[in-house]
Amino acid sequence: MKQLKRKRKSNFSVQETQTLLKEITKRKEVIFSKQLNTTINVMKRMAWEEIAQCVNAVGEGEQRTGTEVKRRYLDWRALMKRKRMKANMKLVGSGFPLPTSDLDDSLTEDIDEKIAFRNDANFEWQNVADFRDAGGSLTEVKVEEEERDPQSPEFEIEEEEEMLSSVIPDSRRENELPDFPHIDEFFTLNSTPSRPTYDEPHLLMNIEKQKLELEKRRLDIEAERLQVEKERLQIEKERLRHLDLEHERLQLEKERLQIEREKWRLQLVSTEKPALENELGQGEKSMLQPQDIEAEKLKLERERLQLEKDRLQFLKFESEKLQIEKERLQVEKERLRIQKEGHLP
């Protein structure tokens, strides 16, 4: 059995915690790197060891290791989350008009919040009591004298994955950069109060309402435009119907004039051949005249049928045109109905 020696170390002082956070700020690109490979892990271990050396350089009497400063940082982060949640609960308990959904969102954001730091190098650490509270969470460190080397790569990678799993930025929120956290509850950096964010959901709701109102107005304008288009098509339909009637009237007039012209032609032919009729016998005259009249009648009937055929063809073409316009209007009406159903709240 290997013996475990327990050595009680003193808590981190305010100066050590201040130095710890400053050094993490300088190396946040390495510590909070999204990549997880051997090279990055080695760089992270080196960064934590450098931070431990800077903390030890403060001269408080304790020699901190990279693992200890990592644990100290995680304790500090956990304390910040607890204070944030307590502050939110106090707001609700005091009757502050914070909706339940806003409280849940704020707590969720605090749980998933990535710890980062301000770029300001001049820190003013005023709330010393909070540092002492945070320091109390790290009261004892076990030093195991076993064959397994704490500085081995396997140990460091395992410890790093265990302790920094909630610190490394999540891929779901990779667009967020690890900037400085809101640590007003831990210590006071300035006396300017932060702007309350409880009205952000109401602001988003108002923006969505305005968007829906604008979309509704646009749909109303589109409906009016379709109504005007429908009326225009109706007027066009009436105009085409009048044109058809006019065309038919002109066609009938043309047929009447054609018949009149044939009538006058027959009369002219009958007056130009009196001598021929006198020379021919009475039998030939009676036989020739009915044949000519019958031929002219057949010719006129043939022309009339051709004109009627052309007129029916024209009417068929116009009917197909109106049917296409009717179908297009029906499709447009159906599209507008579907669009309204999709945008109404």
UniProtKB/Swiss-Prot annotation:
<dbReference type="InterPro" id="IPR026162">
    <property type="entry name" value="MSANTD4"/>
</dbReference>
<dbReference type="Pfam" id="PF13873">
    <property type="entry name" value="Myb_DNA-bind_5"/>
</dbReference>
<feature type="cross-link" description="Glycyl lysine isopeptide (Lys-Gly) (interchain with G-Cter in SUMO2)">
    <location>
        <position position="142"/>
    </location>
</feature>
<feature type="coiled-coil region">
    <location>
        <begin position="202"/>
        <end position="344"/>
    </location>
</feature>
<feature type="cross-link" description="Glycyl lysine isopeptide (Lys-Gly) (interchain with G-Cter in SUMO2)">
    <location>
        <position position="254"/>
    </location>
</feature>
<keyword id="KW-0832">Ubl conjugation</keyword>
<feature type="cross-link" description="Glycyl lysine isopeptide (Lys-Gly) (interchain with G-Cter in SUMO2)">
    <location>
        <position position="273"/>
    </location>
</feature>
<dbReference type="InterPro" id="IPR028002">
    <property type="entry name" value="Myb_DNA-bind_5"/>
</dbReference>
<keyword id="KW-0597">Phosphoprotein</keyword>
<feature type="domain" description="Myb-like">
    <location>
        <begin position="4"/>
        <end position="77"/>
    </location>
</feature>
<feature type="modified residue" description="Phosphoserine">
    <location>
        <position position="106"/>
    </location>
</feature>
<keyword id="KW-0175">Coiled coil</keyword>
<feature type="modified residue" description="Phosphothreonine">
    <location>
        <position position="188"/>
    </location>
</feature>
<feature type="cross-link" description="Glycyl lysine isopeptide (Lys-Gly) (interchain with G-Cter in SUMO2)">
    <location>
        <position position="237"/>
    </location>
</feature>
<keyword id="KW-1017">Isopeptide bond</keyword>
<dbReference type="GO" id="GO:0005634">
    <property type="term" value="C:nucleus"/>
</dbReference>
<feature type="cross-link" description="Glycyl lysine isopeptide (Lys-Gly) (interchain with G-Cter in SUMO2)">
    <location>
        <position position="114"/>
    </location>
</feature>
<feature type="cross-link" description="Glycyl lysine isopeptide (Lys-Gly) (interchain with G-Cter in SUMO2)">
    <location>
        <position position="9"/>
    </location>
</feature>
<protein>
    <recommendedName>
        <fullName>Myb/SANT-like DNA-binding domain-containing protein 4</fullName>
    </recommendedName>
</protein>
<feature type="region of interest" description="Disordered">
    <location>
        <begin position="139"/>
        <end position="175"/>
    </location>
</feature>
